[in-house]
């Protein structure tokens, strides 16, 4: 449970513009005897105000009665810098307590009465939620932008920490952080083994808080779409996905039971479960049925076919990096034998657990019948599994083919006149739900490589006369490799930027640098020498990479570094110059054309 809170703090380092939800971290006395007695103050409503002992008795948060304000479900506490009249405080410390409490009460009502997120029971029924206005105190450490959850020392009361600017009218941060409070209060103060506290649930906390905020403000945001849509192949529970992978929730809500499909996961979870295991259990599904359901969701990702599409598509069209992320809808495949229609997914882009690949196809003719022989490279240790099917699109409207989960199977799909866009969608659907933590990244996650032969269509990029799409979003195609380069960036002609790689922002890239796969350089980063950036890696603004450094997998780097191989996001590793992390995925061979013969 507390590991979830610590994780949020770690991930704050690398959020792209998203306000992270870090549960309040408190100083812990060594023994219970050192803790002052908890004090329950008088309340203005039925719920009590509870001030945690480490805030009150040892002065960690030196609150004062004349710097508080209460409503039915919340108590606001602020620091000395805002004084007793914060509406007239200096600008940096100025806020309106009445407005913040009004926002919070409306959010509370929405989550409780409209979403029916959780019953008003346990600690939620006993105590008002503590809301600390940060950056207004004289003591150090109270400087969070926005954080939510509960006070972790005694686990009695929900808590939000938020800066004045983050709590302005219409605050997304308040909606997101109160979402975290509700999540934790689904199980705090209740007996039994309930609660999404397994490490594999870590990403789902942020996924859910973002989704909850979207219900309040449907046109106000849609999460970190750039990271998610650039890394759709990574595991569903990847930390790279935690603000953007809410679309699976939306699919389940749309098709399988409304909002209750989402809230039941939180209210009926067991503390040993991955959220998808909870969903499987409470809906009485087999693992195969769960896998098919998630594969159908992946098919919907081709056109983002959801009931709230009109609200979030503007964010997809204008997201950070839209010029290169939206240039291609899907991933490339490599030709094993183009003449026989034999292709393979690059190993680095093979889907992990409930990640997926969208492979755009060019039909041989209008109304073509497409035949496919799919074969996965199975690993007993991984419990390998795949689910795959076709999607045809005409005038923006999708039509879905049946999903197959055969590891060595043949399927066909009859296109209709006018269906010029066709996709093969392959989802990693293992035989069991693995419990990856959010920071158990690329080298610790199983990937599920595969090959296929196809007739009646050709993967886009391999057809005769192929032409790249026009470069959009203020960028151009780099002459050496064909990747997308921001017009503001400085990229030498000697630098290789692969067909699907990108250099974004005002970055400077020189020397013999290679940027490959779906990797990208971001912000004002500098990359030089013989550096290789590959797979799903990101070089963030502030980085200055040189020498023979290799950055791959799902790694991100934002610091100066000149040596080492980094294949997994690890905020504690820094620049140590060492070799790459050991990958649990083993090498495999290549199937013959005969093994992939299309026989029906």
Where do the model's predicted regions map?
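Active-site-proximal alpha-helical
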Residues: 227-307
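Surface-exposed patches in mature extracellular/periplasmic domains of secreted proteins
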Residues: 112-129, 189-202, 222-228, 260-268, ...
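Secretory targeting and sorting signals
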Residues: 2-27
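Zn2+-dependent metallopeptidase catalytic core
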Residues: 30-75, 79-156, 164-178, 182-186, ...
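Zinc-dependent metallopeptidase catalytic helix centered on the HExxH motif
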Residues: 6-7, 155-230
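Extended, small-residue-rich solenoid/repeat segments and analogous flexible loops
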Residues: 459-514, 518
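Beta/coil-rich, acidic/histidine-enriched accessory regions frequently appended to metallopeptidases
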Residues: 30, 272-470
């Amino acid at each position: 449970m507390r590991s979830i809170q610590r994780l949020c703090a770690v991930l704050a380092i690398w959020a792209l513009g998203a306000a992270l939800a870090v549960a309040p971290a408190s100083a812990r006395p060594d023994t219970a005897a050192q803790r002052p007695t908890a004090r329950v103050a008088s309340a203005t409503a039925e719920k009590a105000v509870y001030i945690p002992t480490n805030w009150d008795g040892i002065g960690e948060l030196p609150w004062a009665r004349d710097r508080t304000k209460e409503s039915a479900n919340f108590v606001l506490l602020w620091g000395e810098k805002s004084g007793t009249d914060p509406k007239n405080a200096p600008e940096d410390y100025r806020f309106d307590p009445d407005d913040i409490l009004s926002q919070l009460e409306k959010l509370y009502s929405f989550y409780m009465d409209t979403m029916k997120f959780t019953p008003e029971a346990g600690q939620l029924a006993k105590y008002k939620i503590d809301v600390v206005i940060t950056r207004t105190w004289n003591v150090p450490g109270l400087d969070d932008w926005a954080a939510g959850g509960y006070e972790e020392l005694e686990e009695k009361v929900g808590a939000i920490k938020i800066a004045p600017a983050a709590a302005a009218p219409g605050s997304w941060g308040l909606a997101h952080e109160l979402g975290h409070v509700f999540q934790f209060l689904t199980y705090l103060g209740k007996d039994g083994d309930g609660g999404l506290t397994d490490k594999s649930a870590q990403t789902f906390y942020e996924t859910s808080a973002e989704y909850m905020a979207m219900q309040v403000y449907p046109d106000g945001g849609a999460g970190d779409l750039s990271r998610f849509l650039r890394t759709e192949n990574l595991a569903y529970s990847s930390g790279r996905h935690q603000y953007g992978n809410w679309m699976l929730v939306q699919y389940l809500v749309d098709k399988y039971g409304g909002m209750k499909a989402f809230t039941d996961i939180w209210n009926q979870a067991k503390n040993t479960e991955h959220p998808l295991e909870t969903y499987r259990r409470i809906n009485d599904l087999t693992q195969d049925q769960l896998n098919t359901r998630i594969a159908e969701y992946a098919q919907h990702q081709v056109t983002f076919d959801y009931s709230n599409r009109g609200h979030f598509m503007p964010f997809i069209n204008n997201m950070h990096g839209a010029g290169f992320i939206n240039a291609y809808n899907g991933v490339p495949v490599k030709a094993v034998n183009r003449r026989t229609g034999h292709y393979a997914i690059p190993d680095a882009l093979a889907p992990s657990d409930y990640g997926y690949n969208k492979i755009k196809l060019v039909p041989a003719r209008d109304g073509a019948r497409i035949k496919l022989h799919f074969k996965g490279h199975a690993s007993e240790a991984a419990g390998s599994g795949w689910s795959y099917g076709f999607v045809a699109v005409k005038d923006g409207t999708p039509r879905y083919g049946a999903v197959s989960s055969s590891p060595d199977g043949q399927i066909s799909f009859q296109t209709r006149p006018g269906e010029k866009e066709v996709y093969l969608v392959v989802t990693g659907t293992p035989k069991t739900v693995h419990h990856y933590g959010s920071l158990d990244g690329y080298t610790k996650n199983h990937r599920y490589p595969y090959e296929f032969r196809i007739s009646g269509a050709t993967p886009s990029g391999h057809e005769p006369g192929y032409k790249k799409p026009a470069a959009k979003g203020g960028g151009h195609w780099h002459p050496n490799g064909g990747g997308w380069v921001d017009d503001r960036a400085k990229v030498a002609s000697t630098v290789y930027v692969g067909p699907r790689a990108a250099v974004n922002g005002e970055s400077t890239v020189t020397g013999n640098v290679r940027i490959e796969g779906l990797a990208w350089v971001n912000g004002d980063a500098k990359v030089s020498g013989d550096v290789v950036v590959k797979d799903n890696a990101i070089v963030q603004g502030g980085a200055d990479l040189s020498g023979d450094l290799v950055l791959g997998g799902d790694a991100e780097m934002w610091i100066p570094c000149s040596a080492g191989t980094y294949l997994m996001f690890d905020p504690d590793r820094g620049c140590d110059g060492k070799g790459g992390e050991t990958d649990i995925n083993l090498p495999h061979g290549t199937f013959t054309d005969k093994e992939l013969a299309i026989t029906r």
